[in-house]
Protein backbone atom coordinates (compact mmCIF):
# COMPACT_ATOMS: atom_id res chain seq x y z
CA UNK A 1 0.00 0.00 0.00
CA UNK A 2 1.34 3.38 -1.05
CA UNK A 3 -0.05 6.76 0.02
CA UNK A 4 0.22 9.91 -2.11
CA UNK A 5 -0.01 13.45 -0.74
CA UNK A 6 -0.01 16.90 -2.29
CA UNK A 7 2.86 19.27 -1.47
CA UNK A 8 2.37 22.63 0.29
CA UNK A 9 2.88 26.17 -0.98
CA UNK A 10 4.34 27.26 2.35
CA UNK A 11 7.90 26.09 3.05
CA UNK A 12 10.08 26.05 6.17
CA UNK A 13 13.78 26.34 5.47
CA UNK A 14 14.48 28.33 8.64
CA UNK A 15 14.04 25.52 11.17
CA UNK A 16 17.13 23.26 11.10
CA UNK A 17 16.44 19.72 9.89
CA UNK A 18 16.23 17.35 12.87
CA UNK A 19 18.08 14.59 11.00
CA UNK A 20 20.88 14.29 8.48
CA UNK A 21 19.29 11.20 6.96
CA UNK A 22 18.25 11.94 3.39
CA UNK A 23 17.81 10.62 -0.12
CA UNK A 24 17.89 12.43 -3.45
CA UNK A 25 14.92 13.11 -5.75
CA UNK A 26 14.72 10.61 -8.58
CA UNK A 27 13.82 13.06 -11.36
CA UNK A 28 16.57 15.66 -10.89
CA UNK A 29 17.39 15.81 -14.61
CA UNK A 30 13.72 16.33 -15.45
CA UNK A 31 13.44 19.01 -12.78
CA UNK A 32 16.43 20.78 -14.33
CA UNK A 33 14.55 20.97 -17.64
CA UNK A 34 11.66 22.74 -15.91
CA UNK A 35 14.04 25.09 -14.08
CA UNK A 36 15.64 26.05 -17.40
CA UNK A 37 12.17 26.85 -18.74
CA UNK A 38 11.26 28.88 -15.64
CA UNK A 39 14.52 30.85 -15.79
CA UNK A 40 13.35 32.34 -19.07
CA UNK A 41 10.48 34.10 -17.28
CA UNK A 42 10.66 37.61 -15.84
CA UNK A 43 9.07 38.26 -12.42
CA UNK A 44 5.97 39.76 -14.03
CA UNK A 45 5.60 36.64 -16.19
CA UNK A 46 5.86 34.37 -13.14
CA UNK A 47 3.34 36.52 -11.29
CA UNK A 48 0.83 36.30 -14.13
CA UNK A 49 1.41 32.58 -14.74
CA UNK A 50 0.97 31.63 -11.09
CA UNK A 51 -1.41 34.41 -10.03
CA UNK A 52 0.87 35.49 -7.18
CA UNK A 53 2.01 38.84 -5.79
CA UNK A 54 5.01 40.77 -7.12
CA UNK A 55 6.90 39.93 -3.92
CA UNK A 56 6.30 36.19 -4.31
CA UNK A 57 7.13 36.35 -8.01
CA UNK A 58 10.52 37.95 -7.27
CA UNK A 59 11.18 35.39 -4.52
CA UNK A 60 10.55 32.50 -6.89
CA UNK A 61 12.56 33.97 -9.76
CA UNK A 62 15.42 34.10 -7.25
CA UNK A 63 14.77 30.49 -6.26
CA UNK A 64 14.89 29.36 -9.88
CA UNK A 65 18.15 31.24 -10.41
CA UNK A 66 19.74 29.66 -7.34
CA UNK A 67 18.45 26.12 -7.94
CA UNK A 68 21.26 23.63 -8.57
CA UNK A 69 21.45 20.06 -9.81
CA UNK A 70 23.79 19.50 -6.87
CA UNK A 71 21.78 19.01 -3.68
CA UNK A 72 23.52 19.78 -0.38
CA UNK A 73 22.62 20.28 3.27
CA UNK A 74 23.14 23.99 2.65
CA UNK A 75 20.60 24.35 -0.18
CA UNK A 76 18.16 21.54 0.59
CA UNK A 77 15.94 20.03 3.26
CA UNK A 78 14.01 16.77 3.50
CA UNK A 79 10.67 17.28 1.73
CA UNK A 80 8.46 16.13 4.60
CA UNK A 81 10.24 18.56 6.96
CA UNK A 82 10.28 21.46 4.47
CA UNK A 83 6.59 21.50 3.50
CA UNK A 84 4.57 23.59 5.93
CA UNK A 85 0.81 23.68 5.35
CA UNK A 86 -2.48 22.17 6.51
CA UNK A 87 -1.64 18.65 5.30
CA UNK A 88 1.75 18.77 7.00
CA UNK A 89 0.29 20.16 10.22
CA UNK A 90 -1.76 16.96 10.29
CA UNK A 91 1.20 14.75 9.37
CA UNK A 92 3.46 16.49 11.93
CA UNK A 93 6.67 14.86 10.71
CA UNK A 94 8.81 16.67 13.26
CA UNK A 95 7.32 14.53 16.04
CA UNK A 96 7.74 11.19 14.24
CA UNK A 97 10.44 8.77 15.34
CA UNK A 98 13.28 7.65 13.11
CA UNK A 99 11.49 4.31 12.66
CA UNK A 100 8.28 6.14 11.72
CA UNK A 101 10.14 8.18 9.10
CA UNK A 102 11.70 4.98 7.79
CA UNK A 103 8.25 3.46 7.33
CA UNK A 104 7.01 6.67 5.68
CA UNK A 105 9.97 6.57 3.30
CA UNK A 106 8.67 3.27 1.94
CA UNK A 107 4.94 3.97 2.04
CA UNK A 108 4.36 7.71 1.47
CA UNK A 109 4.95 9.75 -1.67
CA UNK A 110 4.51 13.48 -2.31
CA UNK A 111 3.44 14.57 -5.79
CA UNK A 112 5.24 17.69 -7.03
CA UNK A 113 5.05 19.99 -10.03
CA UNK A 114 8.83 20.43 -10.09
CA UNK A 115 10.08 17.11 -8.73
CA UNK A 116 7.39 14.75 -10.04
CA UNK A 117 7.40 12.41 -7.05
CA UNK A 118 9.22 12.91 -3.77
CA UNK A 119 9.90 10.46 -0.98
CA UNK A 120 9.58 11.99 2.49
CA UNK A 121 13.34 12.08 3.08
CA UNK A 122 14.28 13.32 -0.38
CA UNK A 123 16.27 16.52 -0.22
CA UNK A 124 14.36 19.35 -1.84
CA UNK A 125 15.41 22.84 -2.82
CA UNK A 126 12.78 25.57 -2.31
CA UNK A 127 10.43 26.24 -5.20
CA UNK A 128 6.91 27.10 -6.21
CA UNK A 129 5.37 25.31 -9.16
CA UNK A 130 1.89 23.95 -8.70
CA UNK A 131 0.90 20.93 -10.76
CA UNK A 132 -1.95 22.81 -12.43
CA UNK A 133 0.35 25.56 -13.74
CA UNK A 134 -0.07 25.99 -17.49
CA UNK A 135 3.66 26.15 -18.21
CA UNK A 136 4.13 25.32 -21.88
CA UNK A 137 7.04 23.00 -22.56
CA UNK A 138 8.41 20.69 -25.23
CA UNK A 139 5.90 17.98 -24.27
CA UNK A 140 2.80 20.17 -24.34
CA UNK A 141 0.87 23.01 -22.76
CA UNK A 142 1.13 22.07 -19.07
CA UNK A 143 2.86 19.97 -16.44
CA UNK A 144 0.53 17.02 -16.94
CA UNK A 145 1.89 16.77 -20.48
CA UNK A 146 5.45 17.26 -19.22
CA UNK A 147 5.29 14.42 -16.71
CA UNK A 148 3.27 12.13 -18.98
CA UNK A 149 3.43 8.55 -17.72
CA UNK A 150 6.66 9.07 -15.75
CA UNK A 151 5.11 9.75 -12.35
CA UNK A 152 2.72 6.80 -12.65
CA UNK A 153 5.49 4.42 -13.72
CA UNK A 154 7.64 5.41 -10.76
CA UNK A 155 4.70 4.82 -8.42
CA UNK A 156 4.30 1.39 -10.04
CA UNK A 157 7.96 0.66 -9.35
CA UNK A 158 7.59 1.74 -5.74
CA UNK A 159 4.52 -0.46 -5.25
CA UNK A 160 6.31 -3.40 -6.86
CA UNK A 161 8.81 -3.12 -4.03
CA UNK A 162 5.95 -3.60 -1.56
CA UNK A 163 4.39 -6.65 -3.26
CA UNK A 164 5.15 -8.80 -0.20
CA UNK A 165 2.51 -6.74 1.64
CA UNK A 166 -0.34 -7.76 -0.65
CA UNK A 167 -2.19 -6.53 -3.73
CA UNK A 168 -0.92 -3.11 -4.88
CA UNK A 169 -3.12 -0.26 -3.67
CA UNK A 170 -2.65 3.47 -4.07
CA UNK A 171 -4.32 5.53 -1.34
CA UNK A 172 -5.07 8.95 -2.78
CA UNK A 173 -4.72 11.60 -0.09
CA UNK A 174 -3.74 14.23 -2.66
CA UNK A 175 -5.87 17.02 -4.12
CA UNK A 176 -7.64 16.63 -7.44
CA UNK A 177 -5.14 19.01 -9.06
CA UNK A 178 -2.20 16.84 -8.10
CA UNK A 179 -3.75 13.41 -8.52
CA UNK A 180 -4.52 14.23 -12.16
CA UNK A 181 -0.82 13.57 -12.89
CA UNK A 182 -1.44 9.90 -12.00
CA UNK A 183 -2.76 8.00 -15.01
CA UNK A 184 -5.17 5.23 -13.93
CA UNK A 185 -4.76 3.32 -17.21
CA UNK A 186 -1.00 3.07 -16.60
CA UNK A 187 -1.24 2.45 -12.85
CA UNK A 188 -0.94 -1.19 -11.81
CA UNK A 189 -2.96 -0.79 -8.65
CA UNK A 190 -6.35 -0.31 -7.10
CA UNK A 191 -7.08 3.32 -6.16
CA UNK A 192 -8.79 4.26 -2.89
CA UNK A 193 -9.65 7.91 -2.25
CA UNK A 194 -10.55 8.79 1.34
CA UNK A 195 -12.94 11.75 1.59
CA UNK A 196 -13.41 13.80 4.76
CA UNK A 197 -16.73 15.51 5.41
CA UNK A 198 -17.88 17.74 8.26
CA UNK A 199 -21.43 18.50 9.36
CA UNK A 200 -22.28 22.11 8.62
CA UNK A 201 -25.48 23.94 7.77
CA UNK A 202 -27.61 20.85 8.14
CA UNK A 203 -25.58 18.52 5.93
CA UNK A 204 -22.21 16.85 5.50
CA UNK A 205 -19.79 18.65 3.21
CA UNK A 206 -16.09 18.83 2.42
CA UNK A 207 -14.52 21.83 4.16
CA UNK A 208 -11.16 22.43 2.52
CA UNK A 209 -9.11 23.38 5.59
CA UNK A 210 -10.39 20.44 7.64
CA UNK A 211 -10.09 18.00 4.75
CA UNK A 212 -6.47 18.96 4.05
CA UNK A 213 -5.47 18.52 7.66
CA UNK A 214 -7.34 15.21 7.86
CA UNK A 215 -5.44 13.88 4.85
CA UNK A 216 -2.18 14.54 6.65
CA UNK A 217 -3.53 13.08 9.87
CA UNK A 218 -4.60 9.88 8.09
CA UNK A 219 -1.16 9.57 6.48
CA UNK A 220 0.38 9.96 9.93
CA UNK A 221 -2.04 7.34 11.32
CA UNK A 222 -0.98 4.90 8.60
CA UNK A 223 2.67 5.49 9.44
CA UNK A 224 2.44 5.29 13.23
CA UNK A 225 0.16 2.24 13.09
CA UNK A 226 2.28 0.58 10.38
CA UNK A 227 -0.74 0.16 8.12
CA UNK A 228 0.02 -1.98 5.07
CA UNK A 229 -3.52 -3.20 4.28
CA UNK A 230 -6.09 -0.59 3.16
CA UNK A 231 -8.90 -2.11 5.25
CA UNK A 232 -7.07 -1.03 8.40
CA UNK A 233 -7.62 2.61 7.40
CA UNK A 234 -11.34 2.15 8.07
CA UNK A 235 -10.45 2.15 11.77
CA UNK A 236 -9.15 5.71 11.45
CA UNK A 237 -10.94 7.76 14.12
CA UNK A 238 -8.65 10.73 14.73
CA UNK A 239 -10.08 14.17 15.50
CA UNK A 240 -13.63 12.82 15.64
CA UNK A 241 -13.84 11.33 12.13
CA UNK A 242 -15.37 7.90 11.57
CA UNK A 243 -15.75 5.71 8.50
CA UNK A 244 -19.26 5.83 7.03
CA UNK A 245 -19.85 2.61 5.11
CA UNK A 246 -23.26 3.70 3.81
CA UNK A 247 -21.82 6.83 2.19
CA UNK A 248 -18.82 4.99 0.72
CA UNK A 249 -18.17 2.77 -2.26
CA UNK A 250 -15.29 0.54 -3.33
CA UNK A 251 -13.01 3.38 -4.40
CA UNK A 252 -14.32 6.33 -2.38
CA UNK A 253 -14.14 5.93 1.37
CA UNK A 254 -16.06 8.60 3.28
CA UNK A 255 -15.10 9.65 6.79
CA UNK A 256 -17.49 11.98 8.58
CA UNK A 257 -17.62 13.94 11.80
CA UNK A 258 -20.29 16.03 13.46
CA UNK A 259 -18.95 18.66 15.83
CA UNK A 260 -22.07 20.83 15.82
CA UNK A 261 -25.81 20.15 15.85
Swiss-Prot record:
One GO process term, biological-process aspect: response to hydroperoxide
Gene Ontology CC terms: cytosol
Family: Belongs to the UPF0246 family.
Stated name of the protein: UPF0246 protein Reut_A1014
Amino acid sequence: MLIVLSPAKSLDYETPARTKTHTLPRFIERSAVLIDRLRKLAPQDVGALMDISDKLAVLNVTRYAEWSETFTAANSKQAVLAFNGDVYDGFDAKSLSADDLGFAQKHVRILSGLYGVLRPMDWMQPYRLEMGTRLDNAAGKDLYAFWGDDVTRLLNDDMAGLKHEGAPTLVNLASEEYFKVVRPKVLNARIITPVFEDWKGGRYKIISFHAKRARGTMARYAVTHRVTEPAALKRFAEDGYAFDAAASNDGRWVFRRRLED
